């Protein structure tokens, strides 16, 4: 606050600017995933079928309409017909890949791979953004989480977690973050700072090494990258 960065009590209210405690999706001290929170309570519904261990090949397009999907399970193709609609929600990488394998995307690129064009949609796979990050680890003169990571203390933390769902192992690694502006006149933050109360370095093989002396790690992330990439089919 002394340097003009406010405390942000709720960074999900439309304004991220400031320093804030990180929210965690937890229940009873354990991580609560989307599957835990939303699928588990309704798994027995008669109108819901959950298929695991499967990967979608493509959407079935008939007369400019999505009528189903073809997916692979145990390497065998399975065709599934849709009664109403097909919703593509496979993430940044796989959503455009599925669309392009289905003939929806940049026509010239689809023809390169011998895919019949259903819809020439040049924007599919474009505008990929990567949030570059650098980190700095420092030893400090105040107690941090590092002092709690010795082998004997970790046994106690593990028991506290298993028996009471409390303690160190229930906390997210990054507990405090800040959304900052590199220039005061910017309308929105363009830098994100993450703070970890333990130093994490990497050895020559790229393995993470956790410092057990009092230390901190700071991650600096580009929030609004200007460079753009793309997702393309390899085959």
Q: Can you annotate each of these PLM segments?
A:
Residues 8, 49-51, 116-120, 194:
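General small-molecule cofactor/ligand-binding pocket signal
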Residues 25-28, 97, 121, 162-167, ...:
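Active-site rim elements
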Residues 52-55, 65, 113, 124, ...:
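Residues that flank catalytic or metal-binding motifs in active/ligand-binding sites
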Residues 59-62, 67-158, 168:
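Glycine-rich loop(s) and the adjacent beta-strand/alpha-helix scaffold that form part
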Residues 137-234:
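FAD cofactor-binding and catalytic pocket of flavoenzymes
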């Amino acid at each position: 606050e002394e340097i003009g960065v406010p405390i942000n009590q709720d960074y999900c209210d439309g304004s991220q600017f400031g320093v804030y405690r990180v929210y965690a999706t937890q229940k009873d001290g354990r991580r609560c995933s989307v599957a835990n929170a939303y699928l588990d309570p309704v798994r027995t519904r008669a109108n819901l079928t959950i298929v695991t261990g499967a990967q979608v090949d493509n959407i079935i397009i008939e007369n400019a309409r999505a009528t189903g999907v073809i997916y692979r399970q145990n390497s065998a193709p399975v065709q599934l017909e849709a009664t109403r609609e097909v919703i593509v929600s496979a993430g940044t990488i796989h959503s455009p890949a599925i669309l392009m394998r289905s003939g929806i995307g940049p026509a010239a690129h689809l023809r390169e791979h011998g895919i019949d064009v259903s819809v020439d949609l040049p924007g599919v796979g474009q505008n990929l953004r990567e949030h570059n990050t650098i980190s700095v680890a420092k030893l400090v003169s105040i107690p941090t989480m590092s002092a709690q990571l010795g082998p004997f203390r970790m046994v106690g933390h593990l028991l506290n977690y298993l028996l009471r769902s409390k303690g160190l192992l229930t906390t997210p690694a990054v507990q405090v973050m800040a959304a900052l502006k590199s220039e005061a006149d910017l309308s929105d933050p363009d830098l994100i700072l993450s703070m970890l109360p333990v130093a994490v370095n990497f050895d020559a093989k790229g393995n993470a090494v956790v410092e057990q002396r009092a230390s901190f790690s700071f991650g600096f992330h580009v929030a609004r990258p200007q460079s753009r990439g793309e997702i393309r089919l390899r085959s």
